């Protein structure tokens, strides 16, 4: 740390127009008066995020990034500034320097260098996508070919080094936010690498360059130069990971090697770093343009001036906060182009679905409504895409490491999953780490579901995320699969809004009855009906929506025809009608039985003869009914006796109207009241009293005549 503190006086002497560093709590801030105006910088330290958020850049909070700005050289020597760390930083060796510096600035990578380790650099712009392929070999070159230059690196305790550089180009079209070079070094621990590995991945989008460094030296980062060939030196480790800390070390030798076997460095703009620094470089040091990697400039001047130039000062630069949510809102999203690029990824996935590898690097970025996935194969076995073949900028690599030529399906699964999740609206694009971890394994589960039949379609059940959608077969084509992905997104969104359960509710109503359009179906109430044995049963067992068997009502009254025509009558009303009709049938049966009994009695008692009927005595009814006793009405016709009515008395002393009893005796020779027989003896008995003199009658003339 002593050599860092010695640089501060030189910094103030060289840049007299800049204020001394204030040291607020949590970060460093400075105000720089420059010809482009005052710019404020604030650097803070935050803990590093999880792997998913680091690799896919889904963090939603605003974050600060380290930035390096090109500062015009004020010394005549033109040497590039060197890294310096303030004494207030944590007291642990983060960066050591020596006479020999490793150049890490914009030099175009030589695509013709021999390599056993390769990387793919993909460039996205509004006009199209350019692919730059370059290979670097860290093991097959001799020592001492590193061009001296400035190497700016930052070490963090949690295994992530993040530097966000901004080349402030006043003549640029896109202003301050465009010409910037972003570097993020991520050390991912694994157990499959048994040897040092390194590769570099650059991505240029909207005049932005991102460098993914997995090289043994701190791979060309911001504003530094890289030779066409890198050498793999096996003496001193540059990056070492112990207890979660990463240390970047420049040794006094040109032998630099990455010796940690379980490390892998990926680049991504991060919002959480434990330590951040900002450095400034001269315009000559940065040659990054809108569509190219920083090309090598003034290499000879650098080599001459490096030894004689004094130590330079690294000054922080003011930078406005950048958040992924702001970028998502400001950048338009072009779904059509995104689908086309997704088709490219599916074609690549189909080619390598039989292979496997666990450690893969995925870099996904959004650019002008497009999002593409940049992948880096740790075994350095190249996968040539169709777009790369068309551009003729990438050639298949040979001599890949034995046993490391398989690409794992989970890599492609994660890549395709990113497309599916990213196609959502900007509001739902930012997922937490838990959502990523839950969604990644469920979208694409391997080749078993890829082999499903082409007739199958995507199905989404409400509220069941565990039901994974089945992909169409390879015969359906990648374009159809991509369209199905978009349909799946729409289904998920409507599912959250509650539309899918409503559709399923309509399906139930339509399938339950042919009369689903009738309004009464939704208000049908349960009712009960009588079966053939007069037992109550639930009509729901007969039909769900009043689709009953109308043959049960064939023998009912005519009113049921109306009920049959109007099927949406209240079921309770139908129940009452059915019950009443059953009771009526029972009454008719009872009456028929009684009639049958009466017929039997009539047959047993033959009718009386006409003579006997005519011989019945007749009585004239008086006003006081004294002639007929206490009877007030006729038992047959139930009519009251009135004056001057003719009544007849049977031998059983029951009085009836003469016409009524005559009709009855013609049908049955019994008394209607007591069922007593009316035999001919009755006639004889009636004739005998008629032969005897009536005591009440006046004496006859004979008796009167005999009296004298």
UniProtKB/Swiss-Prot annotation:
Residues 550-570 are annotated as: Mediates interaction with TBC1D31. The keyword Zinc applies. Keywords: Acetylation, Cell membrane, Cytoplasm, Cytoskeleton, Endoplasmic reticulum, Golgi apparatus, Membrane, Metal-binding, Phosphoprotein, Synapse, Transferase, Ubl conjugation pathway, Zinc, Zinc-finger. A zinc finger (RING-type) spans 634-675. Residues 74-90, 249-276, 322-332, 484-493 have a biased composition (Polar residues). Residues 467-483 have a biased composition (Acidic residues). Residues 1-10, 333-342 have a biased composition (Basic and acidic residues). It comes from the Eukaryota. PROSITE patterns: ZF_RING_2 (PS50089). PANTHER family: NEP1-INTERACTING PROTEIN-LIKE 2. This is E3 ubiquitin-protein ligase Praja-2. It comes from Pongo abelii.
């Amino acid at each position: 740390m002593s050599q860092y503190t010695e640089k501060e006086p030189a910094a103030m002497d060289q840049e007299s127009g800049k204020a001394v560093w204030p040291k607020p709590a949590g970060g460093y801030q400075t105000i720089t008066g420059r010809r482009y105006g005052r710019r404020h910088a604030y650097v803070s330290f935050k803990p590093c995020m999880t792997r998913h958020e680091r690799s896919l850049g889904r963090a939603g909070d605003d974050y600060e990034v380290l930035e390096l700005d090109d500062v015009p050289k004020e010394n005549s020597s033109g040497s590039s500034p060197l890294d310096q760390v303030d004494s207030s930083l944590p007291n642990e060796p983060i960066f050591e320097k020596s006479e020999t510096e490793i150049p890490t600035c914009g030099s175009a990578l030589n695509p013709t260098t021999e390599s056993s380790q390769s990387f793919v650099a993909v460039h996205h712009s509004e006009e199209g996508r350019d692919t730059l392929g370059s290979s670097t070999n860290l093991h097959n070159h001799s020592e001492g070919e590193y061009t001296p230059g400035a190497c700016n690196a930052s070490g963090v305790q949690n295994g992530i080094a993040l530097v966000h550089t901004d080349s402030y180009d006043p003549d640029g079209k896109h202003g301050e936010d465009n010409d910037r070079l972003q570097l993020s070094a991520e050390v991912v621990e694994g157990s499959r690498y048994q040897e040092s590995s390194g590769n570099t991945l650059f991505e240029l989008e909207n005049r932005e360059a991102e460098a993914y460094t997995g090289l043994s030296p701190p791979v060309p980062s911001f504003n530094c130069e890289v030779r066409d060939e890198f050498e793999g030196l096996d003496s001193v480790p540059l990056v070492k990971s112990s207890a979660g800390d990463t240390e970047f070390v420049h040794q006094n030798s040109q032998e630099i090697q990455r010796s940690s076997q379980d490390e892998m460095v990926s680049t991504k703009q991060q919002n959480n770093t434990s330590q951040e620094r900002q450095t400034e470089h001269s315009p000559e040091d940065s040659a990054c343009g809108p569509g190219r990697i920083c090309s090598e400039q003034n290499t000879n001047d650098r080599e001459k001036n490096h030894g004689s130039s004094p130590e330079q000062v690294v000054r922080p630069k003011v930078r406005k906060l950048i958040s992924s949510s702001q970028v998502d809102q400001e950048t338009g999203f072009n779904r059509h182009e995104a689908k086309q690029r997704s088709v490219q990824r599916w074609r690549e996935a189909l080619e390598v679905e039989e292979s496997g590898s666990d450690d893969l690097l995925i870099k996904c970025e959004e650019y002008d409504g497009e999002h593409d996935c940049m992948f880096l194969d740790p075994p350095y076995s190249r996968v040539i895409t169709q777009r790369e073949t068309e551009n003729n900028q990438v050639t298949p690599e040979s001599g890949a490491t034995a046993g490391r030529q398989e690409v794992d399906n989970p890599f492609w699964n994660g890549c395709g999953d990113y497309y599916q999740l990213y196609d959502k609206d900007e509001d739902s694009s930012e997922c937490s780490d838990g959502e990523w971890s839950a969604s990644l394994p469920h979208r694409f589960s391997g080749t078993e579901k890829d082999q499903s039949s082409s007739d199958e379609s995507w199905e989404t059940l409400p509220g069941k995320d565990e039901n994974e959608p089945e992909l169409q077969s390879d015969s359906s084509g990648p374009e159809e699969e991509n369209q199905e992905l978009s349909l799946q997104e729409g289904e998920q969104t409507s599912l959250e809004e509650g539309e899918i359960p409503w559709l399923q509710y309509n399906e139930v109503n339509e399938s339950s009855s042919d009369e689903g359009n009738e309004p009464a179906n939704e208000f049908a109430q349960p009712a009960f009906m009588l079966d053939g044995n007069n037992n109550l049963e639930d009509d729901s067992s007969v039909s769900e929506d009043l689709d009953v068997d109308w043959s049960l009502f064939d023998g009912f009254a005519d009113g049921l025809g109306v009920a049959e025509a109007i099927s949406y009558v209240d079921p309770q009303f139908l129940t009452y009608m059915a019950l009443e009709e059953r009771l009526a049938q029972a009454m008719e049966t009872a009456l028929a039985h009684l009639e049958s009994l009466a017929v039997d009695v009539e047959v047993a008692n033959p009718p009386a003869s006409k003579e006997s009927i005519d011989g019945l005595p007749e009585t004239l009814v008086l006003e006081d009914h004294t002639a007929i006793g206490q009877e007030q009405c006729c038992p047959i016709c139930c009519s009251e006796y009135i004056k001057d009515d003719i009544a007849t008395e049977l031998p059983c002393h029951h009085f009836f109207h003469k016409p009524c009893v005559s009709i009855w005796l013609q049908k049955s020779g019994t008394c209607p009241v007591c069922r007593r027989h009316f035999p001919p003896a009755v006639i004889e008995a009636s004739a005998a009293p008629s032969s005897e003199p009536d005591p009440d009658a006046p004496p006859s003339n004979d008796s009167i005549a005999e009296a004298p």
